[in-house]
Curated annotation (Swiss-Prot):
<feature type="repeat" description="ARM 13">
    <location>
        <begin position="588"/>
        <end position="627"/>
    </location>
</feature>
<dbReference type="GO" id="GO:0005737">
    <property type="term" value="C:cytoplasm"/>
</dbReference>
<keyword id="KW-0677">Repeat</keyword>
<feature type="repeat" description="ARM 5">
    <location>
        <begin position="224"/>
        <end position="265"/>
    </location>
</feature>
<feature type="repeat" description="ARM 12">
    <location>
        <begin position="543"/>
        <end position="585"/>
    </location>
</feature>
<feature type="repeat" description="ARM 11">
    <location>
        <begin position="501"/>
        <end position="540"/>
    </location>
</feature>
<feature type="repeat" description="ARM 2">
    <location>
        <begin position="95"/>
        <end position="134"/>
    </location>
</feature>
<dbReference type="InterPro" id="IPR016024">
    <property type="entry name" value="ARM-type_fold"/>
</dbReference>
<keyword id="KW-0539">Nucleus</keyword>
<feature type="repeat" description="ARM 14">
    <location>
        <begin position="634"/>
        <end position="673"/>
    </location>
</feature>
<feature type="repeat" description="ARM 10">
    <location>
        <begin position="458"/>
        <end position="497"/>
    </location>
</feature>
<dbReference type="Pfam" id="PF00514">
    <property type="entry name" value="Arm"/>
</dbReference>
<feature type="repeat" description="ARM 8">
    <location>
        <begin position="374"/>
        <end position="413"/>
    </location>
</feature>
<dbReference type="InterPro" id="IPR038739">
    <property type="entry name" value="ARMC8/Vid28"/>
</dbReference>
<feature type="repeat" description="ARM 6">
    <location>
        <begin position="269"/>
        <end position="309"/>
    </location>
</feature>
<feature type="modified residue" description="Phosphoserine">
    <location>
        <position position="337"/>
    </location>
</feature>
<feature type="repeat" description="ARM 3">
    <location>
        <begin position="138"/>
        <end position="176"/>
    </location>
</feature>
């Protein structure tokens, strides 16, 4: 019986809940406009801070009716305004509420409302639009669908401090990427918003500042314009510097520092400018201190990482400012150990930000250690740092894993660290694990780091080889992603450098000649260059050259011919001629050149090329072919003389280029010996 009773009970509870809300909706349909207005006002009071009531009213169909009243010409301005206020309140509930409002096409209705002459109604519409556009479920594109909207919003900026605050907030949330920046810039965003930085309202100043930070991000055009904008006789960068002084609210300091950082990275402010070195950088380091809130520390560290990323001098200055390297170690101490039950809220907060803190610290360490050996050593010597980074490689959060890999990659540029810390912590093990199964963005950085670990002086090279790296890297060369193809082939190139014959044979077997030749015709120049580099490293030391050419000679000569005939740049042709020079150094392999008249004619052609690099590379081929201490040298010399090579050598021995001149003289001596 209990089962039978259960449903009616649930239904009665539901009907009770909806009944208490239904009368609010019913009153919206009253024929008396005064009663409708009072109904909307009562609804407004009922939903404030009550998410359950908001959800009920949405389910009962309040939104379409409110939108209808908002758009009716016969509705009084007061009624329209109250409708906009209620809709704004509903939007402040859950994300599902916002989705429901979007489904009812609330944005076009509110944008239409902005054409009203009544300021209070306009402000209510803007406040509601602000709430909807700042929700993560709202597509930013909805602001740009109608081309008349942005210019109209620009015109409304002068109406009141509320229109200024809401419109700037809408712009800063909906400006995502260069297309949006261009639209706002072309409609006069810089000129219309600049003077708001001196508004008496803190909220207006703050929202205007946020607008400039999103407009300037990675945008040279906007940044170059901002540098020269005057507001009340003061240049914008000077205003931003004033806003990042210690006596200003933290939010303002951080956002001003972002504006100056983005302008600097976009090339509008020099990295050695005082406003960067003496103001922006110290402000961002301050934001990383223990005194700041966790979210401020995250934002401070990430912005600082971005500011110093390309500049070694800023990296050095940051590394010795306020013990920054040691200060960042504290980012890994969250969540803190909780003793009292009263700290549960604190624990929840710490947990929420722990991932972000670790990610920010890794990013900043990566930027700090990008170039300077001493800074890298300081980072690695910081308490348990290598352990923390290695742990970061297996974090559940993709963003933390990516930041940890980037940090390791930055530190792996150090020969000293590759030989010591990286070996002590067997970094290659977790790295190989990361490479087995990770999103492309992580794979790109991890495989790039593997290239460093496979350099000939790295002690990690041997164990990496033994753990199946060849197959893994050959797999990467088949990726759709050009960056992964480059890194895969680059790592194989490093692996093949001065390697034993067995390793070279493993590479050729795993890669397959078909794939090797696919890579030699890759549209990506970097892939082609690294593949040629791999081939050059495979074809080094005579026994290896002869062995490889005895099995793959025909295909390799074919590939070389195609590249020398193709429309390739100087570097590609030079690398290809160097491969030929290596083949010419083989004992039996050189016969593959001597019996190929087409290749010999190409070498002759490049000896007379206008570019010295190509002449030199062709000369290496000739020197190796005519060297008289080797068997068959007389026949080779005779054949090359008949082709006119000796005449070219005489001509080159008079070359103004000392290298070329010396090489030609050395080759001629082989004929005289």
């Amino acid at each position: 019986m209990a089962c039978l009773l259960e449903t009616p009970i649930r239904m009665s509870v539901l009907s009770e809940v909806t009944a208490s809300s239904r009368h609010y909706v019913d009153r919206l349909f009253d024929p008396d406009p005064q009663k409708v207005l009072q109904g909307v006002i009562d609804m407004k009071n009922a939903v404030i801070g009550n998410n359950k009531q908001k959800a009920n009213l949405i389910v009962l169909g309040a939104v379409p009716r409110l939108l209808y009243l908002l758009q009716q010409e016969t509705s009084s301005t007061e009624l329209k305004t109250e409708c906009a206020v209620v809709l704004g309140s509903l939007a402040m509930g859950t994300e599902n509420n916002v989705k429901s409002l979007l489904d009812c096409h609330i944005i076009p209705a509110l944008l239409q409302g902005l054409l009203s002459p009544d300021l209070k109604f306009i402000e209510a519409c803007l406040r509601c639009l602000r709430t909807i556009f700042t929700s993560p479920v709202t597509p930013e594109e909805l602001l740009y669908t109608d081309a008349t909207v942005i210019p109209h919003l620009m015109a409304l900026l002068s109406r009141s401090r509320y229109t200024q605050e809401y419109i700037c907030q809408i712009f800063s949330h909906c400006c995502k990427g260069p297309d949006h920046q261009t639209i706002l810039f072309n409609h006069g965003a810089v000129q219309n918003i600049a003077h708001l930085l001196t508004s008496v309202s803190y909220k207006v100043r703050m929202q205007a500042l946020k607008c400039f930070s999103v407009l300037a991000f990675e945008n040279p055009q906007v940044s170059m314009t901002l540098v020269n904008v005057l507001v009340d006789g003061e240049l914008l960068p000077q205003i931003f510097v004033k806003m990042l002084q210690r006596d200003k609210p933290i939010e303002m300091q951080l956002t001003s520092a972002k504006c100056l950082t983005y302008m600097c990275r976009a090339g509008a402010i020099r990295t050695d400018d005082n406003c960067i070195v003496l103001k922006t950088l110290p402000c961002l380091v301050r934001m990383c201190s223990k005194e700041r809130l966790l979210e401020e520390r995250v934002e401070g560290a990430e912005t600082l990482a971005y500011l110093i990323e390309p500049d070694v001098e800023l990296q050095r200055i940051a590394s010795i400012t306020d013990h920054l390297i040691a200060m960042l170690a504290d980012y890994f101490k969250y969540p803190s150990s909780v003793s009292a039950i009263t700290d549960i809220k604190r624990l929840d907060h710490d947990l929420k930000h722990a991932h972000e803190l670790r990610q920010a610290a890794f990013k900043l360490y990566a930027s700090l250690g990008a170039n300077d050996e001493d800074i890298r050593k300081k980072i690695i010597d910081t308490e348990n740092m290598m352990d923390r980074i290695v742990t970061g490689l297996s974090e559940s959060s993709v963003k933390v894993r990516l930041a940890a890999v980037r940090c390791l990659h930055s530190l792996s540029r150090s020969v000293q660290q590759l030989r010591t810390s990286f070996q002590d912590h067997a970094v290659w093990k977790p790295l190989m694990k990361v490479l087995q199964n990770a999103p492309d963005e992580i794979l790109v950085v991890a495989s790039s780091m593997l290239c460093n670990l496979l350099l000939e002086f790295s002690p990690s090279k041997e164990p990496i080889l033994e753990s199946g790296a060849v197959e893994l890297l050959c797999g990467l060369t088949q990726s759709e992603n050009p960056a992964l193809r480059v890194n895969g082939i680059w790592a194989l190139m490093n692996m093949a450098f001065q390697a034993e014959q067995k390793i070279k044979a493993d590479i050729l077997r795993s890669l397959s000649t078909e794939q090797l030749f696919r890579l030699l015709s890759d549209s990506d120049l970097n892939v082609l260059m690294k593949t040629l580099g791999l081939l050059r490293n495979l074809l080094s030391t005579r026994p290896h050259i002869d062995k490889i050419m005895s099995t793959h000679g025909k295909q390799i000569m074919q590939a070389v011919t195609l590249i020398l005939e193709g429309e390739h740049n100087i570097e590609v042709k030079e690398q290809t001629l160097c491969i030929l020079a290596n083949i010419a150094d083989g004992t039996t392999a050189k016969e593959l050149i001597m019996t190929n008249d087409d290749i010999l004619q190409k070498i002759k052609y490049y000896m007379g090329h206008s570019h010295v690099k190509l002449q030199l590379a062709a000369m290496f081929c000739i020197s190796n072919l005519v060297w008289n201490e080797e068997e068959g040298s007389q026949e080779r010399q005779d054949k090359l003389r008949d082709m006119g090579i000796v005449d070219i050598l005489h001509k080159l021995s008079q070359s103004p280029d000392s290298n070329l001149c010396d090489k030609a003289k050395t080759a001629l001596q082989q004929y005289l010996a």
